[in-house]
């Protein structure tokens, strides 16, 4: 069974409208996430990309640069301005050491060979197009004019296995799907770069790469890549039932900086020139806003700033 990533803005905003405050969050107990003794994706992992629909070269470069940045040592990192790699380094604290992601093959399907309305089986079929092996993740990215089953209703993306038995590593390679929500549900899948559909209508943050849809995809892609390497076959790290697990990042919804509370992303960095919000620096001068990740050592949701 694929593990869906529900960007938990509705839950977050529910708590906000129910009167939860920042002070209430301080009293939260440590978050416990159990390891279920399954295989994790550690070592060198190839990330293959399937672009379904029309993406501009700039949009593709923002996403590819992000993946390259996850393990790059070429970007300076400090407490004041962290790097994308420093965010990804938290995955090393999970059993098995580091996960080094390397961009592999890319496939452009700009002519919509399966149409513009995709069902769940189509995502798995698309993930097999590049014949990724067991030490790979195939990422399927759908353009803004492509609708996907349950997209914007209960999920912004998903991860799973291409095999018939998703709990067995030998049964198939891992895959991720993320959709561009720009014209369909930016208030659901691209928050905090767009006002939320429900809850307090606080001003949205300015997207660091000037593209609400793609910057929202980065948040969801970051979430799903971290969830995939730490729970690729639904028997790694997660909390709750395996049919609806809370994973490395999805267990920390709506948190991007210190002082966050439901409906407020937290204190993040702001570019003095563009006014855009970010918390991590990547290759090619890119800036990204990345979500909090559960830290196994502290049992808390760790933010970069």
Swiss-Prot record:
One Pfam family, short name: Phi_1
Record family assignment: Belongs to the EXORDIUM family.
Organism of derivation: Arabidopsis thaliana (Mouse-ear cress)
Gene that encodes the chain: EXL2
Keywords associated with the record: Apoplast, Glycoprotein, Secreted, Signal
Residues annotated as signal peptide: 1-23
Task performed by this protein: May play a role in a brassinosteroid-dependent regulation of growth and development.
Source organism, top-level taxon: Eukaryota
Gene Ontology biological process terms, A to Z: cellular response to hypoxia
GO CC term, one of those recorded: plant-type cell wall
Name this protein carries in UniProt: Protein EXORDIUM-like 2
Compartment(s) of residence: Secreted; Secreted, Extracellular space; Secreted, Extracellular space, Apoplast
Residues carrying covalently attached carbohydrate according to the record: 44
PANTHER family: PROTEIN EXORDIUM-LIKE 2, PROTEIN EXORDIUM-LIKE 5
């Amino acid at each position: 069974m694929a593990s869906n990533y529900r960007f938990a803005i509705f839950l977050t905003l529910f708590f906000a409208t129910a009167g939860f405050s920042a002070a209430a969050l301080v009293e939260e107990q440590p978050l416990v996430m159990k390891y279920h003794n399954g295989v994790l994706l550690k070592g060198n992992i190839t990330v293959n990309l399937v672009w379904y629909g029309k993406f501009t070269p700039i949009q593709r470069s923002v996403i590819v640069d992000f993946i390259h940045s996850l393990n790059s040592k070429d970007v300076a990192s400090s407490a004041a301005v962290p790097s994308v790699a420093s965010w990804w380094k938290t995955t090393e604290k999970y059993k098995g050491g580091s996960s080094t992601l390397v961009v592999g093959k890319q496939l452009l399907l700009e002519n919509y060979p399966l149409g513009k309305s995709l069902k769940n089986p189509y995502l798995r079929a698309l993930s097999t197009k590049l014949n990724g092996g067991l030490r790979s993740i195939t990422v399927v990215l759908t353009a803004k004019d492509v609708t996907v089953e349950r997209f914007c209703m209960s999920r912004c993306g998903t991860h799973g296995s291409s095999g018939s038995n998703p709990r067995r590593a030998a049964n198939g390679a891992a895959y991720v799907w993320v959709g561009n929500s720009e014209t369909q549900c930016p208030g659901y899948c691209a928050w905090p770069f767009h006002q939320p559909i429900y809850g307090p209508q606080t001003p949205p943050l300015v997207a660091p790469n000037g593209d609400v849809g793609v910057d929202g995809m980065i948040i969801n892609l970051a979430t799903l890549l971290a969830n995939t390497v730490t729970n690729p076959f639904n028997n790694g790290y997660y909390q709750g039932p395996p049919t609806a697990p809370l994973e490395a990042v999805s267990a920390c919804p709506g948190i991007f900086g210190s002082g966050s509370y439901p409906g407020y992303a937290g204190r993040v960095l702001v570019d003095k020139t563009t006014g855009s919000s970010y918390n991590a620096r990547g290759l090619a001068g890119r800036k990204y806003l990345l979500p909090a990740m559960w830290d196994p050592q502290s049992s808390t949701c760790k933010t970069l700033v």
